[in-house]
């Protein structure tokens, strides 16, 4: 009986060691894609809800996912701050009437929606050298 218990204990220990030293069942976290590079000068054509179109300019500085820079529109100018997450961008103007731009980056072009005080419109932008 004692011999049986010893064999059983050794077998259990052996199985535990084999399973414990095998490949980990925990999955590795997915590799994060780096954010798109949006640093530079952009010209924005904003289509407001009333059907008007205005041209705006933004110069973006990028540090990883963080964005800062300068915004110039037809009636106001000021700083910007925002983020970029892979192909998605969000930035806000630091102006009297704060504008929030959200969009998708596609190389040297971006497009999306913007808003101010509950009113929303669409925008398209392209990299430039103004």
Stretches with model-predicted labels:
Residues 1-11:
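Bacterial N-terminal signal peptides that target proteins for export
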Residues 22-26:
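Sec/Tat signal peptide C-region and signal peptidase I cleavage site
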Residues 12-20:
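Bacterial N-terminal signal peptides
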Residues 20-21, 113:
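Generic alpha-helical structural signal
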């Amino acid at each position: 009986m004692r011999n049986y218990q010893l064999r059983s204990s050794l077998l259990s220990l052996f199985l535990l060691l084999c399973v414990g030293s095998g490949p980990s069942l925990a999955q590795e976290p997915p590799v994060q894609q780096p954010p798109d590079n949006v640093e530079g000068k952009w010209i924005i054509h904003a289509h407001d809800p009333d059907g008007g179109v205005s041209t705006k300019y933004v110069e973006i500085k990028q540090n990883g996912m963080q964005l800062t820079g300068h915004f110039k529109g037809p009636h106001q100018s000021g700083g910007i701050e925002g983020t970029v997450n892979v192909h998605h961008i969000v930035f806000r103007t630091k102006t009297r009437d704060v504008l929030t731009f959200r969009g998708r980056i596609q190389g040297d072009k971006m497009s999306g929606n913007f808003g101010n005080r509950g009113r929303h419109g669409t925008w398209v932008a392209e990299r430039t050298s103004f």
